[in-house]
Amino acid sequence: MHFAKLDDSPMFRQQMQSMEESAELLRLRCLRFYKGCRKYTEGLGEGYDADIGFVNALESFGGGHNDPVCVAFGGPVMTKFTIALREIGTYKEVLRSQVEHMLSDRLLQFVNGDVHEVKEARKRFDKATITYDQAREKYLSLRKSTRLDVAATIEEDLHSARTTFEQARFHLVSALSNAESKKRFEFLEAVSGTMDAHLRFFKQGYELLHQMEPFINQVLAYAHQSRECANYEMASLNERMQEYQRQVDRETRNSCVSPTGDGMRHNSRNSQKVIEAVMQSAAKGKVQTIRQGYLSKRSSNLRGDWKRRFFILDSRGMLYYYRKPWNWSSGNGSRSVVHRNMASENSPGLLSRWLSSHYHGGVHDEKPVARHTVNLLTSTIKVDADQTDLRFCFRIISPTKVYTLQAENAQDQMDWIEKITGVIASLLSFQTPERAIMRLSTVDGGDTFSASDSGSLADPYDIEQAESGESTVEHPMTGGNRSRFSGCLQQHDMVKTEKPIDVLTRVLGNERCADCGAPEPDWASLNLGVLICIECSGIHRNLGVHISKVRSLTLDVKVWEPSVLTLFQSLGNVYVNSVWEELLNSESRTSSASRSSGTPKSDRPRKLLVRKPGFNDPISVKELFIHAKYSERIFVRKAIDSQHFQAVFQEIWENVRANDKKSVYRHIVCSEADVNALRGQASYTVSLPLSKMMQMEETLEAKFKSIEEEFQENPAGYSNSRGDGESMVREETSNDCSLLHLACLSADIGMVELLLQYGAKINATDSKGRTPLHHCIISRRYAIARLLLMRGGDPNAVDKDSNIPVKYASQTDLNDSELIALLTDSKR
């Protein structure tokens, strides 16, 4: 007890004064402590900003999977590290918020609330004391001769003043007692809670990095191995450069050059056998380079100027050179026309152009371009040029053109002439009449042929493909659905302009925390679909990501994609709580009925002991409730009938088809249904009502009818997509089809997000071997296709027709460069 006696005495007044002085000293201490706490939280905030800045810099440095420079130095590996560092930064921001909420705010509340109330109570007490003293003195100064009515009035004023005085005195006593009582627990609780927040911060950081420890060690081992390989390669390169320099010196000393350059003797008998062996290996599919090097080529224009070009003579008898060998290609002049199995020279549309650049180094190719120059089968070679005063020259004469070339020295001239002569002889000896006619018809006009280099100095396979003019793309791009696709993109852009927290707080129930009712929640659980406060978010994190994936509405900006926002807008805290807390409100009625029917007390569910907390309740109460709600699921109305489990899949199937995300969510939570079950394995064990079967048949017939009507209205624009439309409809009712397949065909992106959040296999295949990504491309649902690719969808998955998704994309009107890049990224 702070006051042994409540009588107004000098001892009582002295005790109150002592407690007021103590409260004032405590106020000063609290203010100093608050300044330190504020400086600490500001430091944590600056630390978080520095962490995010470092992560952003690392992400910018690491680049992406499509950047070959970043891939070369391990950019994708660094991206994995940035995810962990960003998560640690989020932990630090949570720590800052908790320190500010549990310590700084409570200190400020104590100073501005409790201690300030003591001062206000003292002022009211002093004022009441003066009034009471004046009334008492006035009453005591009355004479015996004073009239009774005047004395009664003064006495009544005295009683009123004393009542006010006592109320002010006891109010001051209450304020002092409250401040004195809080000293015993308020600060201990705040500081210990802050230390617990630090414990959770370091524990979460340790666990996250501990999980990454094997990967970090693996990367370090790989880096060490790469360092050793690089050192070995550098030593090998230095040795090769020294050997090359010695060879150049020997060739320079040993070259015999006549004064006019006419002393050459081109005897090819020594190398003829070697050339024939190499030419025979080309018939077996092995292409080798016989000779390569720089030659000066005389232009065929009026000026007849000389240009230095890099020539290659290969084992197929092809002689070609590189234009502008080490310059950047400008404009579209060097754009390749060779499309490896994907696009032809005249294929229109963005897709064919992009695929060409993808296989040959970019639309604006920065590599040299090889030009086919001459058909050696019908050519002869002569020494010297037309003018006899030039040295080291020789001519290649074909029926269509004469090429005048100049070597750098006599030895190179002799070697080129020997090699070309040997190749011509080999071509004449091995060429059949039929093959000769075919080559003449395809190559004699080869002066206009060009091919991009895709790795080495020349890619013989590309050149051979270009000669034969092969291409597998038969359907040019059309613009039938571009307006609808661009409209969808504009809608997504409008959503992106708003902040996620502004979009989601407009949903019913999202203005308060789903678990404790705290106003203005700014955290969320991605898979549960609820908005929660920062205090509950810490509890959710301790549940584990297999139960709740917690993200901030304001900090984790990249998480809030259109698919996630669509899912959250379809659910809301009110509906989600109706699923997870269905038995919470009805349990009181159930318990009353069980008591009236004589149900033993031990049989009552343990949920009677748990109540839903308020936002002012201690964190221990909230933690108990959240664990019971999500981990133990004691408020969920679960399905216990095994036959019910068999029927649930068919209900989920119909809900996905109808794009009813709420019903699908309820089935997943209440029945714990397997979202990866295949329709052929789950639905046929259930006999559906006749009305349901008739409804399904009517839906199927209506879809076929709409396809036929669309074809009749626009047969030309629909010629390429009719087969896809029919297969898409049939696919919905085919066997071995998962819920994700169906969602990609008939639902929106929010339904796909819901299934992915609950573990749907993104690369599951149906009876035709097609993944959901295949169906998205075929049905032109490009937004969902992009989502699947960003979540790990395999762009190289092959169906039973040996087609990958990009093959189907080449037959559609796809003009999204970002999606095309994801589809054609072979490193994914």
From Swiss-Prot:
Reported phenotype of the disruption mutant: Wavy root hair phenotype.
Any one cellular-component term (Gene Ontology): endosome
Disordered: annotated segments: 247-268, 590-611
ANK repeat extents: 735-764, 768-797
Compartmental location: Endosome
GO biological process: cytoskeleton organization; root hair cell tip growth
Residue intervals of the Arf-GAP domain: 498-643
Coiled coil feature spans: 225-255
One example GO MF annotation: GTPase activator activity
Chain ranges of zinc fingers (C4-type): 513-536
SMART domains, sorted: ANK, ArfGap, BAR, PH
InterPro entries: ACAP1/2/3-like, AGD1/2/3/4_BAR_plant, AH/BAR_dom_sf, Ankyrin_rpt, Ankyrin_rpt-contain_sf, ARFGAP/RecO, ArfGAP_dom, ArfGAP_dom_sf
Any Pfam family the entry gives: BAR_3
Domain BAR: residue ranges: 1-225
Domain PH: 288-425
Compositionally biased tracts (Low complexity): 590-600
Entry-annotated residues carrying Phosphoserine: S441
TM region positions: none
Stored Gene3D superfamilies: Ankyrin repeat-containing domain (1.25.40.20), Arf GTPase activating protein (1.10.220.150), Arfaptin homology (AH) domain/BAR domain (1.20.1270.60), Pleckstrin-homology domain (PH domain)/Phosphotyrosine-binding domain (PTB) (2.30.29.30)
Domain of life (superkingdom): Eukaryota
Chain's role: Probable GTPase-activating protein. Regulator of membrane trafficking. Required for maintaining a straight growth of root hairs.
Listed name of the protein: ADP-ribosylation factor GTPase-activating protein AGD1
Classification lineage: Eukaryota, Viridiplantae, Streptophyta, Embryophyta, Tracheophyta
